[in-house]
């Protein structure tokens, strides 16, 4: 995935930031959001 500079404690928190970044499938890894490009 593509790491973005968004802190998180759970993957659901990454859904919107990833969509806002034009990507999908956010996951929380190492307390940062990681997104999958479209």
Swiss-Prot record:
Subcellular location field: Secreted
Principal cellular location given in the protein's record: secreted
Residue span of region Interaction with Ca(2+)-activated K(+) channels: 26-33
SUPFAM superfamilies with a match to the protein in the record: Scorpion toxin-like
UniProt-listed InterPro entries: Scorpion_toxin-like_sf (IPR036574), Scorpion_toxinS_K_inh (IPR001947)
Stored Pfam families: Toxin_2
Keywords: Disulfide bond, Ion channel impairing toxin, Neurotoxin, Potassium channel impairing toxin, Secreted, Toxin
Gene Ontology CC annotations of this record: extracellular region
Free-text tissue specificity from the UniProt record: Expressed by the venom gland.
Cysteine pairs bridged by disulfides in the record: 8-28, 14-33, 18-35
Recorded GO MF terms: ion channel inhibitor activity; potassium channel regulator activity; toxin activity
Function recorded in the entry: Potent inhibitor of shaker potassium channels as well as the mammalian homologs of shaker.
Domain commentary: Has the structural arrangement of an alpha-helix connected to antiparallel beta-sheets by disulfide bonds (CS-alpha/beta).
Family of the protein in this entry: Belongs to the short scorpion toxin superfamily. Potassium channel inhibitor family. Alpha-KTx 03 subfamily.
Protein name, entry field: Potassium channel toxin alpha-KTx 3.3
Species assigned in the record: Leiurus hebraeus
Organism classification: Eukaryota, Metazoa, Ecdysozoa, Arthropoda, Chelicerata
